[in-house]
């Protein structure tokens, strides 16, 4: 019994440091919001302008790594001895489901507006050229390049899971081949894990900070309840309580059902927007944007705007590359878990094709709808953002569709379910990562899961109190910096170990 308690308890060296660090940062921020905003702007400017190039080179090098995996000596190596656990159709569907978070719904609807109003390459705002490049940049930021980088890490984790039979719940577990067992399980490994956890906590908090206003703005539209910070806090609190009830009452099956409902509802809502918004225009705009992407791809890959200093690559490309970096380990572990029995080539191709299709469908349909509403003068997005918040502008892009009440109910339910599953996943991932070994079929302790969901909720509220997108962007970029190095170490550790255990025959 004592041994069981020890196994299911927290791991102090990776539980308390992130808790203390995040708690202090939240306290300092709330203590003086104005001073915090000054610091946030300074951090954002420093990281993006001084180190933005490093994020761009990271993505490019990882892209070459994807080609090496697909066409190199390990392409036909199987990740585990068993047959694939899921059919190809189910496998692709689970990938799509992982893309339909409320944060994705946030960016998919509004991102194109920012690209058109503050375009790259010195283009005139709101010009024809800006509109032509707008969706192309969304396809770039959410296309094959970032998914190729994820596929490399997914192969690495699948290798450690199913070939080396390692129980990986923290990144330090994968570093034994690179730095040795003494360092991986010692102070160095603890530091790596703490970097990972602090960054992951802030990433999840930012996702909640993006998702919550969508729900509260839906409530204002549907029920006339004014959107305030207090309402945001109440909604987040309700989600945390709901998550605690689900965990305490063993309703995890219900959460999984909700996740499936979210996926099916996403298909339904996207199909509705595609049909009523203008299917012909959407397909034409997508086709044109793919051409623009191919035409400008070399420049997009290396674009830092060092001479023009317009700030577009720093504000968007570097931000999104940091977004991808910060979620890489968590997402890659999930994708590796569902890819047992597949070959390296199959995993790499499946991820890039399946996940690119998912994100391209989302961004094309939602972005095209926003552009049409702007061109037809149905929505004045700058005015909506100035007078209200960004989330209000997003809500209005949905409310402008036919059968607006039914559409808004569908969007409200989708955002609500997406956020419930987000908090559940956040608390589970953080609890698993900060507890001692949890056996297969066991759940991490209830209080630990609730505690982490509360902390993530607090971060979401703090970011909402700061206002605007810059605090959210800065939290992602600052968190992405340490994980930049962690991801590289995991990759190098895999390459070093695979040379020994996957020798060419």
From Swiss-Prot:
It catalyses: 4-(trimethylamino)butanoate(in) + (R)-carnitine(out) = 4-(trimethylamino)butanoate(out) + (R)-carnitine(in). It is a multi-pass membrane protein. This is L-carnitine/gamma-butyrobetaine antiporter. NCBIfam families: bcct (TIGR00842), PRK03356.1 (NF002887). Pathway: Amine and polyamine metabolism; carnitine metabolism. Pfam families: BCCT. One of its GO terms (biological process) is carnitine metabolic process. One of its GO terms (cellular component) is plasma membrane. PANTHER family: HIGH-AFFINITY CHOLINE TRANSPORT PROTEIN-RELATED (PTHR30047), L-CARNITINE_GAMMA-BUTYROBETAINE ANTIPORTER (PTHR30047:SF11). Keywords: Antiport, Cell inner membrane, Cell membrane, Membrane, Transmembrane, Transmembrane helix, Transport. Catalyzes the exchange of L-carnitine for gamma-butyrobetaine. Belongs to the BCCT transporter (TC 2.A.15) family. CaiT subfamily. HAMAP family: CaiT. It is found in: Cell inner membrane. GO terms for molecular function: (R)-carnitine:4-(trimethylammonio)butanoate antiporter activity. Homotrimer. The chain crosses the membrane at residues 10-30, 51-71, 92-112, 143-163, 195-215, 231-251, 263-283, 316-336, 347-367, 403-423, 446-466, 475-495. It comes from the Bacteria.
